[in-house]
């Protein structure tokens, strides 16, 4: 039995460790789009996507994959579409874990946006902004004003030159509130731009923003096709049931 984990998140790494411990005979393959850091998982690691293998369906066929569990970032929709299509074509199981969204708390000042363009354009009223949206393309950066002071925080260095008013901060979570408070104070940040990623790894910025009364421009999640599982324990139960009855298609 072989399970392909579409990873790149703390949840995915945790799932790999839990499944290895619970089902030691289950062979695990852990996929990441690119290596920010070598994942410490009890699995064969595949990086760089599946185009190099002729596509996901071809990879699953040649590697005899029996099931796919998608534990990528909540905003990673393309891989999810490919995985769902491949599992349907091949008649293998597919699960999608989607951690719960962050919810506003008392004292929060959130402004909600459906697209990154709308969010970035709305930042024009602020001189000093922290972007925690992941990679931002040159086209998207053009929505910002040249007289703004922007700090772009990502785990991976941008592949394109940044305008002079955009400063890059390399950082990999998890983050804590003390450090987030210090960052906001150091750069006199007036607004934070964030995706509603959910989870605890990057949630500290929201607490820091609440403390300093800094508004958060929150990018809402895209629609996810097909069924999802928000409870991690329930996902583990379903995977274990599948591993113990491999011939069944379990949804």
Enumerate the language-model features and the residues they cover:
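C-terminal functional extensions of proteins
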Residues: 184-187, 196-199, 205-208, 216-251
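N-terminal beta-loop-helix "entrance" segment that forms/cooperates
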Residues: 29-51, 108, 161-166
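Short, polar loop motifs at secondary-structure junctions
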Residues: 30-38, 97-103, 116, 135-137, ...
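Internal active-site segments that recognize and position negatively charged phosphoryl groups
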Residues: 117-148
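Glycine/small-residue-rich loop that forms an oxyanion/phosphate-binding "nest" at active or ligand-binding sites
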Residues: 57-60, 64-116
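Glycine-rich, highly charged phosphate/nucleotide-binding loops
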Residues: 43-60, 170-178
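Histidine/lysine/aspartate-rich catalytic loop segments that bind and position anionic ligands
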Residues: 143-173
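N-terminal basic/disordered segments at the start of proteins
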Residues: 3-22, 28-34
């Amino acid at each position: 039995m072989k399970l392909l984990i579409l990873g790149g998140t703390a949840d995915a790494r945790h799932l790999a460790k839990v499944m290895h411990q619970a089902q030691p005979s289950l062979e695990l393959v852990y996929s990441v789009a690119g290596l920010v850091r070598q994942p410490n998982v009890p699995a064969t690691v595949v990086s760089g996507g599946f185009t190099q293998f002729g596509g996901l369906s071809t990879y699953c066929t040649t590697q005899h994959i029996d099931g796919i569990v998608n534990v990528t970032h909540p905003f990673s929709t393309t891989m999810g579409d490919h995985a769902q299509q491949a599992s349907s074509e091949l008649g293998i199981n597919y699960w999608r874990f989607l951690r719960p969204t962050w919810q506003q708390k008392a004292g929060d000042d959130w402004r909600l946006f459906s697209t990154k363009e709308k969010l970035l354009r709305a930042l024009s009223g602020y001189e000093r902004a922290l972007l925690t949206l992941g990679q931002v393309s040159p086209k998207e950066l053009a929505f910002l004003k040249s007289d703004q002071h922007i700090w772009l925080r990502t785990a991976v260095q941008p592949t394109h030159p940044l305008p002079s008013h955009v400063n890059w901060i390399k950082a990999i979570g998890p983050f804590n509130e003390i450090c987030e408070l210090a960052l906001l104070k150091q750069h006199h940040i007036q607004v934070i731009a964030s995706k509603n990623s959910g989870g605890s790894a990057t949630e500290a910025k929201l607490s820091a923003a609440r403390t300093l009364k800094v508004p958060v421009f929150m990018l809402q999640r895209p629609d996810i096709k097909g069924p999802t599982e928000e409870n991690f324990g329930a996902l583990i139960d379903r995977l274990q049931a599948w591993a113990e009855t491999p011939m069944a298609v379990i949804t």
